[in-house]
Amino acid sequence: MNPLVIKLGGVLLESDDAMKRLFEALVDYQKFYKRHVSVIHGGGRLIDNLMNKLSLPVKKKNGLRITPSEHINIITGALAGTANKTLLAWALKYNINAIGLCLADGGSVDVERLDENLGHVGKAIPGSPLFLKKLFKEGTIPIISSIGITKDGLLMNVNADLAATALATTLQANLILLSDISSILDGKGQRITEIDSIQAEKLIMQGIITNGMIVKVRAALEAARVLRRPVDIASWQNTEKLKLLFNGVNIGTRVYV
């Protein structure tokens, strides 16, 4: 079975209940299945809250956070520090053998500057799977923040959905984009069980898919195209359904090319 990359987002990183459900599902899943799992995360809300406390502006362009040089150390501390180690602490609480990493560790995901106008915002490029495969053999779950480092040593903030796509490509893994959003919704607020690129772009043009969800959907479409397999967008809210999701059952929206 292909490895599984689980991207975490939304309120999950700030909710003890969400963490509990996620790690209970992971523990139960690993009792019955020997699939290699890697977790990757952002932390947008955590960063927003921190920036507000520091009275620093939060600006985004096309769903991507503008990250000037004076902000990158703060964002790195929030993502590679607080968010990553909080997830690691939960894993250890549930006796899961895990390690906290960033995209650059082991050359797993390479990063280039995406756009000078966005500042320290990186483009994620698939890297080498060797380090992560070694961890898998040792029974370790990598928990990876979406902070990357360029070849010339610059820290970069990478959109976590796009980072997850690059990581899944590196590992030739199945990808789940997990958040508080249970699925893509149509114009009537109903769940869309399956969607392809034509349908997705139509909903974007109609203003039904907006803001950060545009980035998420396009990241899923790109991942589906590169990986040549569908990508799931789903919610963490039901532990039993999570276990089904980890085993390939569609509980949210399945994205096809």
Curated annotation (Swiss-Prot):
The record marks K7, K216 as: Transition state stabilizer. Substrate binds at G43, G44, R65, N157. One of its GO terms (cellular component) is cytoplasm. Its EC number is 2.7.2.8. GO terms for biological process: arginine biosynthetic process via ornithine; L-arginine biosynthetic process. It is found in: Cytoplasm. Pfam families: AA_kinase. GO terms for molecular function: acetylglutamate kinase activity; ATP binding. Pathway: Amino-acid biosynthesis; L-arginine biosynthesis; N(2)-acetyl-L-ornithine from L-glutamate: step 2/4. Gene3D superfamilies: Acetylglutamate kinase-like. ATP binds at D180, I181, S182, S183, I184, L185, I208, I209, T210. It catalyses: N-acetyl-L-glutamate + ATP = N-acetyl-L-glutamyl 5-phosphate + ADP. Keywords: Amino-acid biosynthesis, Arginine biosynthesis, ATP-binding, Cytoplasm, Kinase, Nucleotide-binding, Transferase. Homodimer. Belongs to the acetylglutamate kinase family. ArgB subfamily. NCBIfam families: argB. Catalyzes the ATP-dependent phosphorylation of N-acetyl-L-glutamate. This is Acetylglutamate kinase. It comes from Buchnera aphidicola subsp. Acyrthosiphon pisum (strain APS).
